[in-house]
A protein has these predicted regions:
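N-terminal core-binding DNA-recognition domain of tyrosine site-specific recombinases/integrases
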Residues: 2-11, 18-93
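Ca2+-coordinating acidic residues in Ca2+-binding motifs
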Residues: 57, 98, 106
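Substrate-binding beta-hairpin/strand module that engages nucleic acids
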Residues: 102
Length: 107
């Protein structure tokens, strides 16, 4: 079963993670932010598989997002995505935390 999930697209995993862990647990405004983060993942890394997320892939994602956003917005995006990634690490879907030592940039 783990193999199935590691081959899963990261944007699909993130969407499922929102539904499982955030739906009905956060305010609607916050949920809107999680959904917007999902839309950006679909736009920036539509083919990235969960198993392929490493520090370089994650930093490239942040850099692409930072090209169009202020630093604080990039920090918020990072925190939302990091939550899903840390759960994937805890669940054994990816071997280590690729968000460690991420550099937060912005316009």
């Amino acid at each position: 079963m783990t193999q199935q999930f590691t081959n899963e697209l990261f944007c699909d995993y993130y969407e499922r993670w929102i539904e499982v862990y955030k739906q009905d647990a956060v305010r609607s405004v916050t949920m809107g932010k999680y959904r917007m983060t999902h839309k950006w993942l679909v736009r920036l890394v539509p083919t990235l598989q969960l198993k392929d997320i490493d520090r370089i892939a994650y930093q490239r994602l942040l850099n692409a997002y930072a090209a169009e956003h202020e630093r604080q917005t990039v920090m918020d995006f990072h925190h939302q995505v990091k939550g899903a990634i840390l759960d994937a690490v805890d669940d054994g879907l990816i071997p280590r935390d690729p968000t460690r030592k991420a550099v937060i940039k912005g316009k």
